[in-house]
């Protein structure tokens, strides 16, 4: 008999009224049961919170938290991750679309590892999009210098969070990938299971000043 794992989906929202319905629908329609959807809103000024509350009326596994002050993308995710209660956590961007078998296939892949990532295909609204269907190099030395595994592609054991240091200098998905690599291992699910939306208001990654020094310091290297 197959054990049904408790899956927490963690999403951070901010002014996502245009796309968040599509992503919530793709999560709620997953072929694998979703224990809870944790949404941490960073004080949206549009109708994002109202839309989420509409979904909460129909789905009691959606839990909304609204920050008392703006945190920004990375601190917001770190706060949201701590609220997850499932033994596995999947990260969701508010404007992506999941393939309906995403969680089912990642759960099948992750056994024996602490983090599984899928491939993503980007699409855009009026901006140049790309397709990334290659499995990246997840060697720890490669991970030290660039987050080759985006958070929106991850499913990981909750235990990984206990190995993440508190820092404002390193992005959350890089911290997760490094911790999983060092404590249990990373495996790829080599299928495109996430459609990653690219648009002019989407968050983009840039390295902070003194990044290379910071990444070694937070893991005490």
Per-region residue spans from a language model:
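Acidic helix N-cap motif at the loop->helix transition within catalytic regions
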Residues: 19-21, 46-54, 101
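Conserved nucleotide-sugar donor-binding catalytic segment
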Residues: 82, 136-210
